[in-house]
């Protein structure tokens, strides 16, 4: 298919057009139609030429044929499998690195006010104050405003990771250098305390002294102090002369809400006590395992 084909076609059309009688009014229209026809023929010719050249440039490829003894052609899908179209499965987390039992005492300006050490690390909680703000932290949490991460919680200390090394943050009042306690002992202790108190509520005074505080005849809270056995009081993150103002968000200064709070506490295994300490409010988490 070549250019002479287009010229012969146009010459034939012109020869035929000369034999057609044209009036004065139809002649301009005739030439307009003739030009449009010629333009269309030229465009068609060039498209055919381009198509032929593209087909000639494509390399020939043999058709895939199934080999004898097989029902269908075998395809190599290894390349597709390496694309990770649906993402990559996360590898199972490696066992946690052993915590340094002799980790040096931290220089971090933070105070460990309470711990809830559990045999299940996910349930362990550390109550830490830093820059005047006290919060509860679990394993893997970063202490607010620092790069220190909680590594493990024990009954009298917390191991934190700071600048790539383990450090020890002792419970306030405890002496650094004591043997590392076994995690999980506090679970059994809290469980036994709960059972004891349910059987004999009067035993609460062995662990906690509670006294109502009134100002001008108005209830403002309940003063909390350790009992004859102060260990549990300290481990819960309470401080002498803390004043409890709410339990689980129920205001203890309101008689109706205080009664509701007491009903909840009777069968609760955990609670959040809000205390007022030196003019600031702190939330103290208390867990009593069954």
Swiss-Prot record:
Q: Where in the cell is it found?
A: Cell inner membrane
Task: Give one Pfam family, short name only.
Answer: T2SSC
An annotated GO cellular component: type II protein secretion system complex
Which keywords appear in this protein's UniProt record, sorted alphabetically?
A: Cell inner membrane, Cell membrane, Membrane, Protein transport, Transmembrane, Transmembrane helix, Transport
Q: Which residues lie on this side of the membrane: Cytoplasmic?
A: 1-28
- Ranges annotated as spanning the membrane: 29-46
Which biological process annotations from GO are given for this protein?
protein secretion by the type II secretion system
Coiled coil segments of this chain: none
Segments on the Periplasmic side according to the record's topology features: 47-290
InterPro entries reported for this sequence:
PDZ_sf (IPR036034), T2SS_GspC_N (IPR024961), T2SS_protein-GspC (IPR001639)
Q: What family classification does the UniProt entry report for this protein?
A: Belongs to the GSP C family.
Protein role: Involved in a type II secretion system (T2SS, formerly general secretion pathway, GSP) for the export of proteins.
Supply the name of the protein: Type II secretion system protein C
Supply the source organism for this entry.
Aeromonas hydrophila
């Amino acid at each position: 298919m070549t250019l002479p084909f287009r010229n012969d076609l146009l010459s034939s059309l012109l020869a035929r057009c000369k034999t057609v009688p044209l009036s004065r009014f139809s002649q301009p229209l005739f030439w307009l139609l003739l030009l449009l026809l010629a333009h269309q023929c030229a465009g068609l010719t060039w498209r055919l030429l381009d198509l032929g050249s593209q087909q000639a440039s494509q390399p020939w490829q043999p058709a895939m044929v199934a080999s004898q003894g097989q029902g269908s052609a075998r395809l190599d899908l290894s390349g597709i499998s390496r694309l990770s179209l649906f993402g990559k499965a996360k590898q199972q987390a490696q066992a946690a690195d052993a915590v340094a039992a002799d980790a040096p005492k931290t220089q971090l300006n933070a105070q460990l006010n309470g711990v809830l050490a559990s045999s299940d690390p996910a349930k362990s909680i550390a109550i830490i104050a830093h820059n005047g703000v006290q919060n509860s932290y679990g394993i893997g949490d970063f202490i607010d405003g620092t790069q220190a991460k909680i590594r493990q919680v024990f009954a009298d200390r917390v191991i934190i990771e700071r600048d790539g090394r383990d450090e020890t943050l002792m419970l306030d009042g405890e002496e650094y250098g004591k043997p590392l306690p076994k995690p999980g002992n506090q679970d059994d202790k809290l469980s036994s305390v709960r059972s004891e108190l349910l059987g004999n509520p009067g035993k609460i005074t062995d662990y906690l002294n509670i006294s109502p505080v009134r100002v001008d005849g108005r209830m403002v809270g309940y003063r909390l102090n350790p009992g004859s056995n102060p260990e549990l009081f300290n481990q819960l993150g309470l401080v002498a002369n803390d004043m409890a103002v709410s339990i689980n968000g129920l205001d203890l200064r309101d008689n109706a809400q205080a009664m509701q709070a007491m009903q909840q506490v009777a069968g609760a295994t955990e609670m959040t006590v809000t205390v007022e300490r030196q003019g600031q409010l702190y939330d103290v988490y208390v867990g009593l395992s069954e």
